[in-house]
Amino acid sequence: MNKELLWEMLATPSASGRETELGKKLYGYAGTFSHQVRTDEIGDVVAVLNPDCDFRVLLAGHMDEIALLVTAVTQEGFLRVNRTGGVFAPLYPGHKVQVITERGPLYGSVVFTREMAKKEDLAPKDLYIDIGAKSKEDALAHVSLGDPVIFDTDCRELLNGCVTGRGMDNRAGAFIVMEAVKKAREMGCAVGVYGAATVGEETTMNGAYFVASRVKPSLAIAVDVTYTSDYPGVDTAATGDVRVGGGPVLVNNPSCHRKLQRLLRRAAEKQGIAVQTEAATGRTGTDGDVIHKTGKGVPFSLVSIPLRYMHSPAEVGSLADIQGCIDLLAQFLADLDPSLDLTWY
């Protein structure tokens, strides 16, 4: 596994709508193994294999992360914020953060009071960020309204091949997409492959729409994270039994294509990879939901990384699960025949 790349991706700020720094790195990396590298007006990065093939497979993993957004500054120089994506405000008081400005990161601390800790309905708009400014004018000399704010946390390797950090949702998925495309080429993949690190999934899903509208894929696989049930306080009867370290997760739901599911399972068997299954009753909540409805419709499925504590500053996943997703998808791509017929009857 290219741990150096994964660690670099997890360390790079990529708030939804501000993915440029990470996108530039992936654009350069994709050029080392793909036949083409493409981008678009909003910053998606696409590694392409066999661009002349009419049978096109889109892999999509979003590279953006949730964040706060600076909305105002008090007369005393404290920053007011609101959410960008699925932010849970009670996690923030007392934490170190980075404000991502045009000049680079600016560090701060989220104001903490005991009264705030007791508040049951704490919302992002209730938070204040202390950057050490002496006044509103002092703060605005360094920060602009609209600047994103992310947790200032590091990635660390834990016991048994686990890893913890901010924004594994879904930089780990974008990493898998790039590495799966690279490995598929090494395995002699013959179909057109478009491995996309998409922008904006946590907010608008515009990245998935831009990519799918241009690629016009024959089929698509979204790569994202999913909740697990292997830690205290989770009811497995309600969530199902999904575990970190248990392997890639495939979802059975009304929109994921059953033939693609079977092909993914077959690829896992070839690689000797254990897979887990989860059930969903409707949308997947991933880029796949948008890709599915572009053009005349795109058959799609979903491969998920088991992840504990999603949208927290210390998400926990498994390096073995990440590698399992890479190997499964590379085998899936290498096995595909351009004559594949996905019609039902």
Where are these regions (language model features)?
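N-terminal hydrophobic/helix-forming segments and targeting peptides
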Residues: 1-345
